[in-house]
Amino acid sequence: LSDRKVQVAGSSLLWAVVLTATKLIVGLFTGSLGILAEALHSALDLLAAGVTLYAVRQSARPADRDHPFGHGKFENFSAFVETLLLVLTSVWILWEAQERLRDPAFAGPRTSVWGFLVIGFAIWVDWHRSRALARVARETGSQALEADALHFQSDILSSAAVLLGLGGAALGLPQADPIAAVVVALVVLHVAWGLIRRSVHALLDRAPEGVADDVRKRVQAVTGVEEVDSVRVRTSGPDLHAEVVVRLDGGRPLTWAHDVTDRVEAAVKEGYPEARVTVHAEPLSPAEAPSEEDRETDSLP
């Protein structure tokens, strides 16, 4: 799975280079703020794709002495950095757009067939990139790749806004270009807000919604578990870490308790195959412990 993640991230980086160069050349030739904004956006995409590639390579490294829980946080940090780049892009676009909207001498960009072709090409590339990234992200649980996929889905919408701006300029509406640039910025900010929340939640070890309750139900269904004291879950990149404290009959042999904790771990992994599960067993108090009669009727060995 890690090889697939690296492969799709590397492909995304290569296409980011192609799009950045193409948009920059056409933007300078036509003088379109919309295309130049897209060129800057693609340049930041290039940086983000590089960060993502580095992150998925690092996150695949096994746990070591200094990182006993693995390197999955590289992916969460990558998503956070990409979000900051999206915000910077939006701020620059909004500033340049308002400058042109306030300039009465602004005559609009030079329109040409090249402007329409390069943005159409960008939409085609971003559509294929986002689909590939989203597919691998779903299969591997990679937040970094998912962030990249959402990023490029927003690029499709923003590129469509640029096409509208170029079309307006061709029809004698010069203000259409900076207005389209504002649309680009707003779309990017909208996506950035969602990404920054999710990446910060992961970096701060916020429990994934509903997962702790589901794990608790699975553990409670295991024969031999008398009580579930606590369930703590967190994510580290694509990995889920679960810590479970259960109460067992303290009058049973240690081998029996070990067997129960093994089945608790198996029950959690049935729903979350890639989870790293830690189970701690505590004995029930004497008043809570099952009677000898209950133990004799227990089907467990």
Say what each PLM segment does.
Residues 1-9, 66, 71-74, 192-301:
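Peripheral (non-transmembrane) domains and long loops of multi-pass membrane proteins
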